[in-house]
Amino acid sequence: MPTNWKDSGLRWYWVVVLVFVADQLSKQWVLSNFELYESIQLLPIFNFTYVRNYGAAFSFLSDAGGWQRWLFTFVAVGFSVVLSVWLRQQPSKMWRLNLAYTLVIGGALGNLIDRLQHGFVVDFLDFYWNTSHFPAFNIADSAICVGAALIILDSFVTGKDDKKTDGIKE
C-alpha cells in the first residue's frame, strides 16, 4: 500500500473534480436555457432535450413513489467512499483502474447533487434513430459507464499481465 496520497490512486482525484464540474456546469446550462422537454436538434441523430429522471439508469424505479431518491443517494455515497478507499490503496501508476474509479466517483457525486438539490437528475443528451430514442443521459452517466467499462477491461488486461509474469524472476 502506498505510504502517502501522492503515491496512491488519490493522486487521480483531479478527474473527480473535472467530471463533477463539467457535469454540474452542463446541467446548470440546461436548467437556465431549456423548459422541461424542450429539445434542440444538433445532429440528425442527436438532440439536447431537457428531461427529469427520478430513477436510476434507464429511469429504473422512476415512479416508485420517492423512496428511491434516498436509496440512490445511499448507493452513490457508499460507492464513492468504497472507491475512494480503494484509490488510497492503489499505486498511482495503475492508471486504468485509478481513472476508472475516479470517473465513477465523479459521476456518482454529480448525480447525487442533483438528487439532493432537485429531487431528480437532469438528463439532456438524447440520441435517436428515426422515432426510437435511447434514454436521455448526462455527463455524469457517461463517466460512470466509461469507468465501469474500464474496471471490466482492467480485470481482463491485469489478469493477462499477471499470467505473463508468473514464474519470471526479477
UniProtKB/Swiss-Prot annotation:
GO terms in the biological process aspect are:
proteolysis
Q: What is its main location?
A: membrane
Cell location = Cell inner membrane
Which keywords describe this protein according to UniProt? Aspartyl protease, Cell inner membrane, Cell membrane, Hydrolase, Membrane, Protease, Transmembrane, Transmembrane helix
Q: What residue ranges are annotated as transmembrane?
A: 12-32, 67-87, 94-116, 133-153
The first-level EC class reads: hydrolase
Task: Tell me which domain of life the UniProt entry assigns to the organism this sequence originates from.
Answer: Bacteria
Q: Which PANTHER family match?
A: LIPOPROTEIN SIGNAL PEPTIDASE
For this entry, the protein name equals Lipoprotein signal peptidase
